Amino acid sequence: MAKIMAVNAGSSSLKFQLLEMPNETMIAVGLVERVGKDDAIFTIKYGEGQKFTDVLPLATHKEAVELSLEKLMEFGIISSYDEIKGVGHRVLHGKEKYADSVIITEDVMQDIESYTELGPLHIPPNLIGIRAFQAILPNVPQVAVFDTAFHQTMPEENFLYSLPYEYYTEYGIRKYGFHGTSHKYVTERASELLGRPLQDLRLISCHLGSGASIAAVAGGESIDTTMGFTPLEGITMGTRSGSLDPALIPFLMEKTGKTAEDVLNVMNKESGIYGLSGLSSDLRDVQTAAKEGNHRSEMALRIFANRIHGYIGQYAAEMNGVDAIIFTAGVGENSDSIRERVLRGLEFMGVYWDPSLNNGARGEELFINYPHSPVKVIIIPTNEELMIARDTVRVGGLVEQNA
């Protein structure tokens, strides 16, 4: 048995889970919010429903890591730091070099740092989180688990943009895709639930949260995905526009007087469900307003669902069929009305979903198709932390995993 920490460091947050491997038991889950503020919030859940919350000043991620480890000791969750045998870190970008998770060395750190321009909001805190754990647990293997790695199996026809080829060779401009850890987890879990080898399956994974992406997974490998060079491409999201005509950028610069950076900021933070509805990026608020007759909210929901619906058709065509459609992440797992909007009309391709199973289904593994449906429809709550822990064990050679 080995205790593994799975870590996701954001710009002002630190999320972690402590898991016992290889039996994959979650021991504790923690969240530090508002890092860098005088009123940072620390929350930890452990044991049989125990929960502790504190508000205190935390100037740095290193202080947040120190506090997290101290509380694990204080509450008897661990008796010594030596019990932690590995730390896995979610890292946004690994470019083409990293098609799998790796032990973090100084060379790996330099590579990740050089990718900052591809993820200026995410990569700096990823690095800060790694450095903080390295400082406190210097002899513990640290593993980088890249959001982009799973999609490195995409063929050229799906990852290349129709730009001068030199832009790819010189600047690395191509589709990378994201949410790879989530897509990998749910497709592997779908194989188990279907009782069929992953190598024999054609799956469409819909990771629908505030950030959202869809992946076509054939034979266990990602062959296409909606997010691109950055997480801005693809379907409509909470605050992101998704794909649109790139000529809009200079047009909007001229019309509004904004810089290119300003326009990109609008597309990343003021668009999507929020921009369309004018109300909120939270689909629950928008759904409530739509039920009350708010046209823009209803329109935003239609656009969101229609983009997903269209990609399901596209990816089924790319794989010459589909065996199962998976819904995961906050919206995918919990919104029966969004699932209904997405699935409605897909009967032509063998998707026969059961409204009585879909209605009210929230956050649980569940088939929501009729038994005779050629294409299965499955809700699978994602578990990126477990995937990170599995990779940490595998790459670090820490314990024998369950067969």
Curated annotation (Swiss-Prot):
Q: Which CDD domains match?
A: ASKHA_NBD_AcK_PK (cd24010)
Q: What is this protein called?
A: Acetate kinase
Q: Which Gene Ontology molecular function entries are recorded, alphabetically?
A: acetate kinase activity; ATP binding; magnesium ion binding
Entry binding sites for Mg(2+)? 8, 384
Where does this one sit in the cell?
A: Cytoplasm
* Function summary: Catalyzes the formation of acetyl phosphate from acetate and ATP. Can also catalyze the reverse reaction.
Q: Please state the pathway this protein functions in, per its UniProt record.
A: Metabolic intermediate biosynthesis; acetyl-CoA biosynthesis; acetyl-CoA from acetate: step 1/2
Tell me yes or no: is Magnesium among this UniProt entry's keywords: yes
Catalysed conversion reaction: acetate + ATP = acetyl phosphate + ADP
For the site labelled Transition state stabilizer, the residues are: 179, 240
Q: What is its EC number?
A: 2.7.2.1
- The catalytic site is made up of 147
Describe, as the record does, how this protein assembles with itself and its partners.
Answer: Homodimer.
Which cofactors are required for activity?
Answer: Mg(2+); Mn(2+)
Source species taxonomy: Bacteria, Bacillati, Bacillota, Bacilli, Bacillales
Q: Which UniProt keywords apply?
A: ATP-binding, Cytoplasm, Kinase, Magnesium, Metal-binding, Nucleotide-binding, Transferase
Binding residues annotated for ATP, in chain numbering: 15, 207-211, 282-284, 330-334
Residues noted as binding substrate in the record, renumbered to the chain:
90
For this protein, what does the record note about how its cofactor is bound?
Mg(2+). Can also accept Mn(2+).
- Provide the GO biological process annotations: acetate metabolic process; acetyl-CoA biosynthetic process
Q: Which GO terms describe its cellular component?
A: cytoplasm
